[in-house]
Amino acid sequence: MVPESAPNGNSQPLPSCFTTTGVPSPSKPRVSELVLQRMKQFKRADPERLRHASEESPQKTALGDDVPRSPPEETVGENEYKLDATDSDAAMALALQQEFRREEASSHHDSLEEKGLFFCQMCQKNLSAMNVTRREQHVNRCLDEAEKAQRPASPRIPDCPICGKPFLTTKSRISHLKQCAVRMEVGPQLLLQAVRLQTAQPEVDGSPQVPSFSNNVGGLKRKGVTTKREPRRRKVNKPEAPSEDLLVAMALSRSEVEHCPVVPPLRLENAFSEKIRLGAEKKSRKKRPPVCPPQLVTQDSETTGRQIEDRVAQLLSEEAELSCTPPLLASKISKEELEPAGWRARLPEGKRNFLWELSALTGAWAEESFYTVGLFPPIVSQCPSKEPQLPLELPKQGEPSPRRPPASQSSLPVSHSPKIRLLSSSQRERQALQDLVDLAVEGLSSSPQPGSRGVPTGLDLVPSSLPLTGFVLPCKKTLKKDDSASLSLGLLVTDFGAMVNNPHLSDVQFQLDSGEVLYAHKFVLYARCPLLIQYVSTESFSSEEDGDLTQRALLSDVSSEAAHAFLNYLYMADTDMPPSLVPDLRSLALRFGVSDLVQLCEQVPAVVDLEGEQPEETSEDCESRAETFLELLRSVWVDNEEEVETLLKPELCEEERERVNEAEMEEIYEFAATQRKLLQWGRAADPDGSTNPHGEDGAVSEPSLAGVQSNRQLENTEHMESSGLEKEEALASWEQEGHSTPLQDQCPDWAGKAEAQDALGEATDDPSFCSRHRRGKECLPLHPNKAHGCKQPLPSNPRVSSELSQITVDHEEQSDHVRETQADMAQAPTPHSCSLVSQSSVDGSPSQSWLHLYHTSHLSPSVSQSHSSISRVASPRSLSPTTPTKQRRGSNIVTLRKDAGHHRGQQSSPIAGHRNRGILISPAKSPPIDLTQSVPEPLSPRAQDPLHFVKKEDEVILLLDSDEELEHTKTESVSKDSPEGRKVPEFSPRSSELFSVIDVEEDHEHFQSPLKREAGLQHGEEGQLGNQSALGCRDIPWLLCSQKTSLDEDSATDTSWLVPATPGVSRSRDCSSQTQIKSLKTRIPSDETAQQTPRPNLERRTMLETAQQFSVIMPHTQPITLGAFDSGRQAYRSPSHPYPRHHRLSSSQPSCPGPDFTRWSQKSSAPRPCLPNLPAADDVVEVGDSDDEVASHQGNSSPVLDGDPPGPMGDYCWNEPLSPIPIDHLNLERTGPLTTSSPSSQVLEALHSDDCHSPGLGTTPIRGSCGTLRESQERSSLAGSPEALWDDWNEEEGQSPEAPPVAQMLSTRTRKPDRPETPKGANQKKNLPPKVPITPMPRYSIMETPVLKKELDRFGVRALPKRQMVLKLKEIFQYTHQTLESDSEDEVQSPQIPAELPCRQASTTETCNPSRLPTGEPSHPDGDAQLPASQESMATSVDGSDNSFSSKSSSAEFGAAFEYSDEDKDEEVGVTASQAAIQAADTEEAVRRYIRSKPALHRQVLRYQPVELAELQAELKQNGIPVAMGKLSDILDAQCITFTTAAARKEKLKHKRRQPSGRKKKDQK
């Protein structure tokens, strides 16, 4: 029992057993209990038992509690245990066993390993069956595998083998490899090797590297964090890891595959694409690609070489196409040229140099071979055959007519030879017949030669074009052509002809302007016309028709027939072209570089010319229709076709065309008709008188017609003399002074003419005769050559002037012949006339000075001005027949001058003087004189010598209406009578400058010899309708015109400054009121003075001021008293002219024979040399324009005194509100002080300035004279419209039949200066070329509303309705884009600004007025003389700017405003609308000046920062400028000045808050 129990004695009951056995219990229940306990323990699991064992005591306690046991039993059990544990070995062993079991149970419960279960952490495999070593090995393997699986995650995509850049995707790696290879210049082969090595290394070294790497990674990943990340990477990378090598291989294979196909096509294109891409990526890459082509694109040297060869070939081919003679083809040459061509072709084949030599035309080879080579590329083999044939035909054509018929016969064979290539025999025959038909239709086949020629020409045009190059192919060449070759060529041509305009397989369409569509084929265009195919490729667009997309190009400006013919030539070298299509074909050929066709087209006209030689000659004689029209007009004027033939000279015709436009020609035609009637009437009135002068005039003027006209004019002159004896007396006084001394001595005929002119001066009183006489004057300018022809100077006698005027009239009729003679005379200026002029000027006789004045305006600075003013004045009349409409272009219209140089040469001669007077009609040749440039020798003999002074000034003749001319003639005669007018030429160089600027055309000078001019100017302001009388009446307008012309110097005399339409005779007095006021020479009879309107008064003032200025500039050579007739004359003359003369006269002769003039001189004061200048103005002939013309002239030009002193006169003249000529700043600058005021107003201004200025005031600053001029300008602007002007003149006439006293005139001028003459500025602006390029105005009207809002926002303007925004933007643009200089800064283009300018001018005028007011005080020089010439020019420019403003608003309105301002100061008149406008302008100007005077405020305005309106108003009030809030806002708006009323609104709101209830308001009240 014991041994058994021992092994099984793991249970506690064993001790009991042992105890039992050892100490048997006496009772049975006790044994049974033990057995049961064992059984229970055996049945229970160890853990339970263990737990129970631990709980044994409690259980036992519980059992003991539950099952009451006997105390003896319990005690026995306890004792047994105690005995076993302590005393017995068995108990000890049991305790140990129990303890061990407890530990085992606890360990087994803690970990699986202790329980004998082992699992792999990596793969979860059960390792319980393995020992510790094997388990470790297994775990290591799993770790390695895990590392291997995770390792590809880091190097998933290989780095770049070149730069080592890592990649996230294979695509990025592939693209980078190519780009990097290009950048690093790694060849494709080397790149492939690097990639392969990169992929091979992991394969070869994968085992060693991977383990090591894996070990590292494993070691890292054994950490908790790494192990967690690894599985994630494995999941992502597992699929990619196995394909890594595959991906690399694919990348490499792709690059290789791309290179192969890409290299050939991409070589040209991909290179650019790569470059572009590289450039887009990095800027540095842009530089390298051009140096080295992309490496990956270029595969090998062979491919690269081929590509280079292709490029070079392409370039060479392009050059060949562009070259006029394509490279010769050796094989073709040999074929075409049998023997000679063969060896010649061989040479080119062997050496390229031979071909070049052939192309160089060295002459080593026959022309035929050269043609063959050159024509083949464009024309293929056909060309050579055609060329030989053409040469054959050409010789035939060149042969005489008898041979030509054979040529026609041979032309068929010849045509066959060329057509051998192009057409079949039947086709050739048809073409030949067609050519004959065309020629017959054209009337070319009338003669056998043309007919014969026509056939070959049509057939051989193409070949003939080749000979045109200078090579004539031998006939043998055509003979060489075989019939078979010709047949094949004909078939080829036929086949190609079938393709012309054939939609079948057409890949190009040409759409014409008519909408017709022509079909063509690119390959034909490519082969025949590279430029056309290029045009198609660049300019074509896709059009879809019937579902097919085709290229379509637009052929504009081409007729359908011409386009068809062009395609026929391209397709089959068809040379049959109707002559009517030749121009269009030639234009197409030139457009698309078909040189052969161009040559053919040139040949066709040649044939036509041969057939019709007469028409060609006729066209040569008359180059243009305009010429023919001019000839017809001349024939009408001359009344004889023979004279027309003389006028048909090409030189004259060319000049005429240059100077005369169609509108002007029409006006001239009308004027000619009127003048004829007047001339006829004059002849009937006084045939005897006219006959005598005619003889003289005929002697003077070469053409007989001129003589006849001069006779007629003499008759008219006599009639005028009878009507104006007073004027004649004045002329006589001039003669006494020495007018005719040199002139008469040198030209007795002219002296006689001068007498005739005197008679004319008398007759000038008769308005009708005056008009005729004016016309005569106008005609005179037409005959400067004739005048020159008579080398004798013009007599100083008024008769001579009248004769000259009559001659001028005759010349008008004989304008053609006269022009021819004039050109001749201009070429050879008469020394006698020149000497005469100089002598007269030296002598200082009135007549001489007159003559000098004419010449002086062109020759000497001062004298030239006065003369030029006179001449220009006179020339305007002369021009009137030719250019009544556009006096500005009067010189151009009457462009009879031959050569400007010749004119200049004549300027030194008396003829030049006459031209300066403006008697000569043709100003075209004379160079325009720069008004600003004044010869500084006022008293020098040359300056005195009108010829010298003239300096080739273009003579402009103003065309006047019959009434105006008559009036002007009277005035001219009066002015001629006064010696003062004559003295005018001696005036300061300035006046000469002004007039020189006004350059009257040399032809005028030529037409009227200096004597004639002087006589006409001196005596013939009456007699000078043709001469100075007409000029006197029109002088101011003419001067204005001439000044403008001078402004337009470069363009020759300008007739744009024509005076507004001449009023009726009643209005104009003896002379035009303007002329009377302006021209001092012209007597200012009481009637004339009365007739003179306020504008003439202004003109006189202007002339006086100008004269004073001139006197300052030029010491008065001769004191001249202003005669009444002289003053009248000045009135008639443009202010510029009258100024110089009147000024000189006044300075030289304080007293003038004429009572009116004396009064004038007294008022103007002796120092006023301007009065003498005024006589100079008399010389100017005014041309009556239509109302429109008058209006334009009034706005544009003011009377400019050609002889006036440059500065002051310029002021007055250029302040020409009345003068029609627009004055530009440039013109003003050239003119210097010249002003373009209306003739009458300028005269008045000159007179006033003279009154204000002492005789020494000739140089008085323009400021003083400026004011006067501005006054006159104001009047002129008031009379901006012809009606206003004439009304003004009529008012003047009504005011004083006699010339108003100088004091009155000065006062008037002074008033007028008070108001700046904005219209004058406006006029100037019209013709003013912008100093800075004019920025084109954006098209605001088509802009979207958001864009408009943005534009307005730029200028700080709030959004407005679209229409208002457009208007506002346009206004802003006008203000911000000025074309004038700083002087015109204030002159914003808006009409309001012009009003402001008048204010500024008014201030300037005011400064001048004080000096003017003391008419007789020489202290005036302090006012006007204080300003230097530069200041005068500045003042002139200011006036011009003011005039420019007048253009913005009606010149009449501004003129009225100016008059009102003047009257407001000098005469109190009820406030009128014009006065209100002037006041508004003054206010606006004051506001502008105030803003400019405040730098901070000005800066704020310039920055478009809003100005507080209320504050500005308050400041203005404080400074004495009260302005209503509404008016101020309008002014600021007009100036584009942003302002705000926020402060005022806030104040109002505050005020309202303070007074919330109506009761409070009432209480306060």
Curated annotation (Swiss-Prot):
Residues 1120-1413 are annotated as: Interaction with MUS81. Residues 499-1565 are annotated as: Interaction with PLK1 and TERF2-TERF2IP. Residues 1-87, 203-242, 279-305, 387-418, 683-769, 789-848, 861-943, 963-989, 1063-1099, 1128-1212, 1249-1337, 1381-1449, 1546-1565 are annotated as: Disordered. Residues 833-848, 861-875, 1437-1449 have a biased composition (Low complexity). One of its GO terms (cellular component) is chromosome, telomeric region. Keywords: DNA damage, DNA recombination, DNA repair, Isopeptide bond, Metal-binding, Nucleus, Phosphoprotein, Repeat, Ubl conjugation, Zinc, Zinc-finger. Pfam families: BTB, Slx4. SUPFAM superfamilies: POZ domain. The modification Phosphoserine is found at S111, S845, S875, S926, S940, S988, S1249, S1254, S1384. Regulatory subunit that interacts with and increases the activity of different structure-specific endonucleases. Has several distinct roles in protecting genome stability by resolving diverse forms of deleterious DNA structures originating from replication and recombination intermediates and from DNA damage. Component of the SLX1-SLX4 structure-specific endonuclease that resolves DNA secondary structures generated during DNA repair and recombination. Has endonuclease activity towards branched DNA substrates, introducing single-strand cuts in duplex DNA close to junctions with ss-DNA. This is Structure-specific endonuclease subunit SLX4. The lineage of its organism: Eukaryota, Metazoa, Chordata, Craniata, Vertebrata.
